[in-house]
Amino acid sequence: MEDRRESELKTFCSKNILVILGFSSIIAVIALLALGLTQNKPLPENVKFGIVLDAGSSHTSLYIYKWPAEKENDTGVVSQVEECKLKGPGISEFAKKLGEIDIYLEACMERARTVVPKSQHAETPVYLGATAGMRLLRMKNENLASKILSTVAESITRYPFDFQGARIITGQEEGAYGWITINYLLDKFIQKSGWFNLKPRKGDTQETYGALDLGGASTQITFVPQNQVLESPENTLHFRLYGKNYSVYTHSFLCYGKDQALLQKLTKDLKNTNGTIHEPCFHSGYQRRMNVSHLYEAPCTRRFLTSLPFPELEIQGTGDFQKCQQSIRPLFNTSYCPYSRCSFDGVFLPLPQGDFAAFSAFYYVMGFLNLTSEEGSFQSKVTSTLEAFCSRPWAELQMYFGDVKEKYLSEYCFSGTYILTLLLSGYHFTAETWKNIHFMGKVQSTSVGWTLGYMLNLTNMIPSEEPSSTRLSHSTYVFLMVLFSLILVIVVIIGLFVCHRPSYFWKDMV
């Protein structure tokens, strides 16, 4: 009788335990299958390409981007595969030689034809955006600017790509697209979250970076002010990206790119000379001759227009950083401000907050001066470096930097001093907030600038709402796979143990 009760108890317990174990094993198997299927989808073979030409004031560059077709709405999936710099000046310089535009574009367009697979030529969009150089030409001669763009368009349409047009983008667009680019590359638009990282790591906040862009003819500042009233609607843009709203301040200062700023300074200094300028922003021993008419033909220098008795200007460098900075400061008119805060020329500027990425000429000039590393995060180091560099004789520089073009080498003293003065006197950074400026050329092998943001916007690859599901991080995925595998193994071991446990085990359970 007792043996029968023991047998019935064993059978009852075994069935219940096995049911529980079976249910647990099914859940573990389903979890493993679900993780495997969602996380290890085969990589899409269909890669898409996009081409953007940046027609700047001093040169034109072509960028080729690629991305997996099935991940267009993910963040950080677009990568740069090629950068090709066209030989020659910016397209605005072709006003009197339109017939040379075909040759100008040929090398880089042929390079694009080689890089992009032939089977995808017809579906690869090509965009050309012209910036401040063409904005200035349009101010001077709108018909001529239109002719250049139409000639460029005719040339590009001869290639087997999906040409989407050539246009002059506004300064506001240039600033906004640069801001989108840097924050897309730094992965700042999507809040990182998962089962085991619900709280961001210390220092891993999701605040966006501000963008500082400097070209030859204009400069842009763009950022999201925190807890500040945006007093100037024309400088405010509203974006909804990945389910989050952004109120972005942006302004483009036409004529305040480094090349046009130099022309402004030289034209201003001409008033009190007899045709010779002793220029502290050029190195001692350096000489340059310029046609006076060239100085006054640009819209940026018209405010200094005056009648001069000499046709040619002679520049003689003196190499003095302090005097150079003193002569640059008057370019920024801070005497008038109709708002609570201004940058210069009466333009509203909120208090710069948070980290900023400084790219384009900001990066190239500071890179030449070896100020893009941690040392460059101290304003005092930047000042002392420029002071030492500007004082070096021209002959010495030519000997040490013989491979650098004379135009660029001769202007690094001015350009570096101008950048320092623009950031301090124009944008009102301080010695304390200078450390928040990060000079960047590339992020993850992709050039920082407005072109990527431009393409992302035109191809609608940044959704307004956050994707409903994203892949787990690699560490989370591995952890879950190991966890559910262990659960499955433990369930099997317990099941085997239950089925083969000696009879006294069941007696102990009574």
From Swiss-Prot:
Cofactor(s), by name: Ca(2+); Mg(2+)
Positions of transmembrane segments: 17-37, 478-498
Post-translational modification: N-glycosylated. Cleaved into two polypeptides that seem to stay together by non-covalent interactions.
Enzyme class: hydrolase
Residues bearing attached sugar chains per UniProt: 73, 245, 274, 291, 333, 370, 457
Keywords (A to Z) from UniProt: ATP-binding, Calcium, Disulfide bond, Glycoprotein, Hydrolase, Magnesium, Membrane, Nucleotide-binding, Transmembrane, Transmembrane helix
Record-level GO cellular component terms: caveola; plasma membrane
UniProt-listed InterPro entries: GDA1_CD39_NTPase, Lactate_DH/Glyco_Ohase_4_C
Catalytic activities: a ribonucleoside 5'-triphosphate + 2 H2O = a ribonucleoside 5'-phosphate + 2 phosphate + 2 H(+); a ribonucleoside 5'-triphosphate + H2O = a ribonucleoside 5'-diphosphate + phosphate + H(+); a ribonucleoside 5'-diphosphate + H2O = a ribonucleoside 5'-phosphate + phosphate + H(+); ATP + 2 H2O = AMP + 2 phosphate + 2 H(+)
Cystine connections: 84-108, 255-300, 281-324, 337-342, 390-413
Entry's EC annotation: 3.6.1.5
Extracellular topological domain: 38-477
Places the protein is found: Membrane; Membrane, Caveola
Catalytic residues identified in the record: 174 (proton acceptor)
Membrane topology: Multi-pass membrane protein
GO biological process: nucleoside diphosphate catabolic process; platelet aggregation
Cytoplasmic domain ranges by topology: 1-16, 499-510
Tissues expressed in: Highest expression found in vascular endothelium, smooth muscle, spleen and lung (at protein level). High expression also found in stomach, duodenum, kidney, lymph node and aorta (at protein level).
Assembly and interaction partners: Homodimer; disulfide-linked.
PANTHER family: ADENOSINE/GUANOSINE DIPHOSPHATASE, ECTONUCLEOSIDE TRIPHOSPHATE DIPHOSPHOHYDROLASE 1
Family: Belongs to the GDA1/CD39 NTPase family.
Function: Catalyzes the hydrolysis of both di- and triphosphate nucleotides (NDPs and NTPs) and hydrolyze NTPs to nucleotide monophosphates (NMPs) in two distinct successive phosphate-releasing steps, with NDPs as intermediates and participates in the regulation of extracellular levels of nucleotides. By hydrolyzing proinflammatory ATP and platelet-activating ADP to AMP, it blocks platelet aggregation and supports blood flow.
Protein name per UniProt: Ectonucleoside triphosphate diphosphohydrolase 1
Organism: Sus scrofa
Gene: ENTPD1
